[in-house]
Amino acid sequence: MNTAGRLLLLCLALGLVFESLGIPVADDVEAVRDTDPDEKDPSVHNSLKAVYGDCGGERCRFGCCKTDDGEEKCQHFGCP
């Protein structure tokens, strides 16, 4: 049990050492200097929107395709 306790303390000490070597987190004081590109780049947020198309009077999420009859339908409704 003595060895297990020493091993536990060694692991905790090494964990603290490696944690202190990590990248520091910005404080609220330095929030003005935030350089996170995801928050300021609008193209990141626009890429998550669904694109809708108009297929013969129907709004389709995944685009249109033509059936064998030449009729336009939404792609997810059994187009060939």
UniProtKB/Swiss-Prot annotation:
Keywords: Disulfide bond, Secreted, Signal, Toxin. Residues 23-49 form a propeptide. Residues 1-22 form the signal peptide. Expressed by the venom duct. GO terms for cellular component: extracellular region. It is found in: Secreted. GO terms for molecular function: toxin activity. Its main location: secreted. Disulfide bonds join 55-65, 60-74, 64-79. Belongs to the conotoxin H superfamily. Probable toxin with unknown function. The cysteine framework is VI/VII (C-C-CC-C-C). Displays a mini-granulin fold, a structure composed of two short, stacked beta-hairpins connected by two parallel disulfide bonds. This newly described fold is derived from the same cysteine connectivity as knottins (ICK fold). The name 'mini-granulin fold' comes from the structural homology with the N-terminal region of the human granulin. This is Conotoxin Vc7.1.
